Each structure stands twice: as C-alpha cells, then as structure tokens.
Amino acid sequence: MKKTAVLNSHISSAISTLGHYDLLTINDAGMPIPNDDKRIDLAVTKSLPRFIDVLETVLTEMEIQKVYLAEEIKTANAQQLKAIKKLINDDVEIKFIAHSEMKEMLKSPLNKGNIRTGEITPFSNIILESNVTF
C-alpha cells in the first residue's frame, strides 16, 4: 500500500505528470469544472471533503512556485484566505485574479487536473503552479 499522503489514484497520477509551470486546481463544490478526463470529483456531501484539507494533503506531494486565487476571496471569504496563507510557503507567489479568469484557466492545456471538493464556502478555489524540485 502507498505510504505517502495522497491515496487517491487520480490525484496521485495528476501530480506525477506535472512538469515546470503545469497547473493543478482544487475547487469548491460550486466551481463549474469542465466534464473531461481532468475532472477529479471528491465531493461526497456538503463540506466533505473540505477544501483546506485537500489542499494541505496535495501540498505534501507537490512542489509549487505560484498560486492563483480569486480576488473576491479577500472580502467574501477572508477566513479561508487566512487558512490558505498558513499553508503556502513564503517563497511562493500568491497572485489574485478575477474569478472569471480562474474559470478560464481550468480549461488550459497546462492544467493537469481539476479537483472538486465538497467545500461550500465562497471562492474556495486555488490554482497551483508546479515548480521543479531541483
């Protein structure tokens, strides 16, 4: 049995395919994720699993250099923003963009996976940009 934190085979596979600058997204239950082979639906019910728990686990196996967050999270979900910032290392750039731009980035060829959680708080979405480990 696998020893590392990510047990979900689809998430593990998506992370293993990442190269420098590739993207992986973690989304709340309401984000309109394209129905394609990159969709990884973990949502079981409201708040299960929580966005922040999935993010924390993914970060144990993924090297990131930048994250994208919706500008709207600053006012609509300051508590979630604070929790995200606790998990992101100081050397990782945080870029705030319009929520509409985030939706478009889900379709990018650089995006290797869209993870849907059961999160039901507004703007609980993040795009992780992969870095190299050397």
Swiss-Prot record:
It is found in: Cytoplasm. GO terms for biological process: D-ribose catabolic process. It is an enzyme of class 5 (isomerase). Substrate binds at D28, H99, F123, S124, N125. GO terms for molecular function: D-ribose pyranase activity; intramolecular lyase activity; monosaccharide binding. Its EC number is 5.4.99.62. Disulfide bonds: none annotated. Belongs to the RbsD / FucU family. RbsD subfamily. HAMAP family: D_rib_pyranase. Catalyzes the interconversion of beta-pyran and beta-furan forms of D-ribose. Homodecamer. This is D-ribose pyranase. It comes from Staphylococcus epidermidis (strain ATCC 12228 / FDA PCI 1200).
